Structures are given as structure tokens and as C-alpha cells.
């Protein structure tokens, strides 16, 4: 084999090995975002729900500080239940529809996709029904979430 071809092949192999260590992107996050958009008031963006309270966003600890934060707490627990079923909620794709602030999940009942869709649907509907309190965004979690 030509040394130049061997060098290129080696570089590709090294790149693929490095890429295999990169965690998968949260494919489901895009679907969850669409569900949230379906249920929240127009003046809010879905991004306002990240880093809200003790549970909306990455991780979570302590007691939820309000009803909206409780939605995230329940959602986190639902994802935990999905993982116990060997279902990765952060990467599974599901079939859903939004129609006039109503959400529908279409995957087969009992399937991983349906379970995750139901987790996201329940949380998004909860977001739509809960008051957003601006001062609970970006709170000091070390102080309020222990």
C-alpha cells in the first residue's frame, strides 16, 4: 500500500476512535423543546426553563422550590424510570404532535419511545399549567437546593 494512503487511513482510524468517546447528543432534547413550546405562554421561550429552580436543567438536588420546579423534578424521576427499563431517554426519538396546546404521543404503548414521550408530554403540560417566577431562574443552588 502507498505510504500516503496508509497515513490517511491511519488518521481516519484515529479520528474515529476519538469520536467514539464523545457522548451522544441529546436528540430527544429537540423534541422536548417542541413540546414545551406547544404548552407555554407565547411571551416565554423554552430556554427560560433551563437553570430554573433546583431541578430544571442539568442535575438536581434538595426540594423543588415551586410548582414549576416540581414539574422538572417529576420529569427527572420519569427519565430515571426510563433508564431502569434500559431505555435511554436522552437519545430516543419518538413520534408526537402538538395541536392547539394539546400534545399527542403516537408510538406503541409500552415501547421505550412512548415511555419517554409520555415523560416529556407530562412535563410540558405541567410547565404550561405552572406559574413562572422570574426570581427562581439561576438561583444559588448551594443555598436553596440542599
UniProtKB/Swiss-Prot annotation:
Signal peptide bounds: 1-19
GO molecular function (one): calcium-dependent phospholipase A2 activity
Stored InterPro entries: PLipase_A2, PLipase_A2_Asp_AS, PLipase_A2_dom, PLipase_A2_dom_sf, PLipase_A2_His_AS
Compartments where found: Secreted
Predominant location: secreted
Propeptide position ranges: 20-27
Co-factor note (free text): Binds 1 Ca(2+) ion.
Active site positions: 75, 120
Recorded superkingdom: Eukaryota
Reactions catalysed, as given in the entry: a 1,2-diacyl-sn-glycero-3-phosphocholine + H2O = a 1-acyl-sn-glycero-3-phosphocholine + a fatty acid + H(+)
The keyword Disulfide bond is annotated on this UniProt entry: yes
Cofactor needs: Ca(2+)
Organs and tissues of expression: Expressed by the venom gland.
Cross-referenced CDD domains: PLA2c
Keyword vocabulary terms for this entry: Calcium, Disulfide bond, Hydrolase, Lipid degradation, Lipid metabolism, Metal-binding, Neurotoxin, Presynaptic neurotoxin, Secreted, Signal, Toxin
Intrachain disulfide bonds: 54-145, 56-72, 71-126, 78-119, 87-112, 105-117
Binding-site residues, Ca(2+): 55, 57, 59, 76
GO terms for cellular component: extracellular region
Self-association state and partner proteins as the record states: Heterodimer; disulfide-linked. The A chain has phospholipase A2 activity and the B chain shows homology with the basic protease inhibitors.
The protein's role, per its UniProt record: Snake venom phospholipase A2 (PLA2) that inhibits neuromuscular transmission by blocking acetylcholine release from the nerve termini. PLA2 catalyzes the calcium-dependent hydrolysis of the 2-acyl groups in 3-sn-phosphoglycerides.
Family statement drawn from the similarity comment of this UniProt entry: Belongs to the phospholipase A2 family. Group I subfamily. D49 sub-subfamily.
Protein's recorded name: Basic phospholipase A2 beta-bungarotoxin A2 chain
Amino acid at each position: 500500500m502507498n505510504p500516503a494512503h496508509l497515513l490517511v487511513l491511519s488518521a481516519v482510524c484515529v479520528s474515529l476512535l476519538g469520536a467514539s468517546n464523545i457522548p451522544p447528543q441529546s436528540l430527544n432534547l429537540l423534541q422536548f423543546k417542541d413540546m414545551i413550546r406547544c404548552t407555554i405562554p407565547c411571551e416565554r421561550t423554552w430556554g427560560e426553563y433551563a437553570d430554573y429552580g433546583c431541578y430544571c436543567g442539568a442535575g438536581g438536588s434538595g426540594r423543588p422550590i415551586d410548582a414549576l420546579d416540581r414539574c422538572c423534578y417529576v420529569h427527572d424521576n420519569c427519565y430515571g424510570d426510563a433508564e431502569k427499563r434500559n431505555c435511554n431517554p436522552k437519545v430516543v426519538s419518538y413520534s408526537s404532535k402538538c395541536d392547539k396546546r394539546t400534545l399527542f404521543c403516537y408510538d406503541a404503548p409500552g415501547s421505550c419511545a412512548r415511555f419517554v414521550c409520555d415523560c416529556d408530554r407530562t412535563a410540558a403540560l405541567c410547565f404550561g399549567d405552572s406559574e413562572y417566577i422570574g426570581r427562581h431562574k439561576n438561583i444559588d443552588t448551594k443555598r436553596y437546593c440542599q
